C-alpha cells in the first residue's frame, strides 16, 4: 500500500480564514473529525495510523467512524488476524481504532513505545511456509 492522501495536511489556517473546512477520508478519519472538531489532537492522527495499519492487513479501510458510532461492525484486528501477526501489533491496532479518543494512545510517543515494546506473549507466529517446512522436516527426517 502507498499513502497518497496528504491533501488535508496541506490545508493551513490563515488570519483571513479562521475556520478550517472539514477534510477527511472515510475509513481513515477519527470520529471527532465528523462531529466534535474541538476535540482534535494527536489521538486523531493515531486513529488514522491505526486505520492505515488495519487497511494494510485487510486490503481495504475499516468501516467509517461515523457508521461505527451508529452500528459498530468493525471486526477487531485481534479477532481477524490472531495467529497471523503478533498479538502486540494486533492489540496496538485495536487500541488506535477505539471510538472514544480518551481510550486511544494520547501521543505518538506512547504509540511508538507500544510498537517497539518487546512481545511478552512469545515469538511471532510462524508463516505458512515456515510451518510447512517444519512439518515436512519432522515427517521426512
Give the role of each language-model region.
Residues 12-16:
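Conserved catalytic-core motifs of eukaryotic protein kinase domains, centered on the activation segment
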Residues 27-122:
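C-terminal lobe helix-coil module of Hanks-type protein kinase domains
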Residues 122-141:
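Regulatory extensions appended to serine/threonine kinase catalytic cores
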Residues 17-27:
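Activation loop
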Residues 1-3:
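Conserved protein kinase catalytic/activation segment
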Amino acid at each position: 500500500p502507498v499513502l497518497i492522501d496528504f491533501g488535508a495536511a496541506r490545508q493551513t489556517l490563515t488570519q483571513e480564514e479562521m475556520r478550517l473546512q472539514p477534510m477527511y477520508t472515510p475509513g481513515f478519519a477519527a470520529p471527532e473529525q465528523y462531529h466534535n472538531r474541538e476535540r482534535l489532537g494527536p489521538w486523531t492522527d493515531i486513529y488514522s495510523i491505526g486505520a492505515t495499519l488495519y487497511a494494510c492487513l485487510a486490503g481495504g479501510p475499516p468501516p467509517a467512524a461515523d457508521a461505527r458510532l451508529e452500528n459498530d461492525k468493525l471486526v477487531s484486528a485481534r479477532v481477524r488476524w490472531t495467529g497471523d501477526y503478533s498479538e502486540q501489533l494486533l492489540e496496538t491496532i485495536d487500541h488506535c481504532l477505539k471510538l472514544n479518543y480518551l481510550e486511544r494512545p494520547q501521543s505518538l510517543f506512547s504509540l511508538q513505545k507500544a510498537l517497539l515494546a518487546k512481545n511478552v506473549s512469545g515469538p511471532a507466529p510462524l508463516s505458512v511456509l515456515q510451518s510447512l517446512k517444519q512439518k515436512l522436516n519432522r515427517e521426512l527426517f
